[in-house]
Amino acid sequence: MSLFPAYEIFARQLQDTGILSDAWVDGRPRFRLQGVVLSLAQAHALKRAAERIGAIYQELIDLLWGHPEWLDTFFGLTPYQKLMWLSAQGRWHGIARADLFLCRDGRVQCCEVNSDTPSGEAEAVLLNRLLHPYHGDVHDPNRGLASAFWRMLVTSHGGRQPRTVGVVYPTELPEDLSMIAIYRQWLEARGCQVVLGSPYNLHACRAGVAMFGEPLDLVIRHYKTDWWGEREVVWTDAAPYRDPDPLEGPLRLLLEAEYNGHVTVVNPFGAVVTQNKLSLALMWEAIERFSPLARRWIRRYIPATYRLTQMTLDDVANHRQMWVLKSAYGCEGDETVCGPYVSDEEWRDTLASALPEFWICQRFFSVAPEPNGRNPNYGVYLVGGRSAGFYTRLSVAATDEEAITAPTYVVRRGI
């Protein structure tokens, strides 16, 4: 293994890609140059787990399609969330990221799957590419991510290559600009015209739907499903959203164009259900409705998860070390509270403030840390149902905004 470059030199190399320019956050390095190197057995176990978890979600979708009453009785979806689900007709997947952990006892556990607007692709691909020469004879598992992404888009588009692709994202937020940029690079390399904009830039045209005057064949939707629908607060003491109403005009325009076969949307709006963490609770609360194989995989990979409404609050309050609280659509570090990492007071305050119908309780599991004590979160990209790469973040406790990203490699030989 070669000596790593100085971080400032690496940061300039990163900037030279034209994709990633923010190598620091609040003065701290965002990245670790030393990669995580997985054994063949570890990589296989993680990839296999991600694909099996994807299959569990597909079975959940099939179950829910046969039990539409669960949209109300279990998920409590809003009218526009139900519109998204029903319009998608069971379609939910294009690209997802399963966040997996290797535990001290050897298990692989999945805390959640981002099936709606997964991010990190730029960091995963570019870090691996730039730092590969410093890691000796290892395999870069992210080399094929761009090709897998393209094959998925073509398949989603009925086997036809899209000509004009609109990438719809929250243009006022900078967090995922690198991902938008690398998507654009991948698509333009395939000969596509790429148009960037927000839902408010969509408009009707003779061909179906357009953005800035350009008719679109395909839309990559990097705008969360819970932002397209009605916005709901999840805390008893939270002020209502200033913009709680659904994006009715853009949403109806896109759904109608897709229904009429004028545009393909990836990820499909059916992700409004799979992204909802109550889906994890459904796996456990209705486990007997799943196939025997899916039951075995749920017990193997998904920590016991239940709706907070089904729990005895005093029992949860008194067993902080056993549980993690998560809101239905919250992100890591945002509306996720790990019992072992907070005080008794913070835990009880969370339970007192949380609106139970929007929360789940998930069993805490102990992660096998790296030698330096950080906990690796192995994000496995699932593209068209197949594992296609890794996005690894290292954190002191739960994965949050202070986690650092490291390249991920796999040994070429050995165990």
Regions found by a protein language model. Give the residues of each.
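Preference for protein termini
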Residues: 1-415
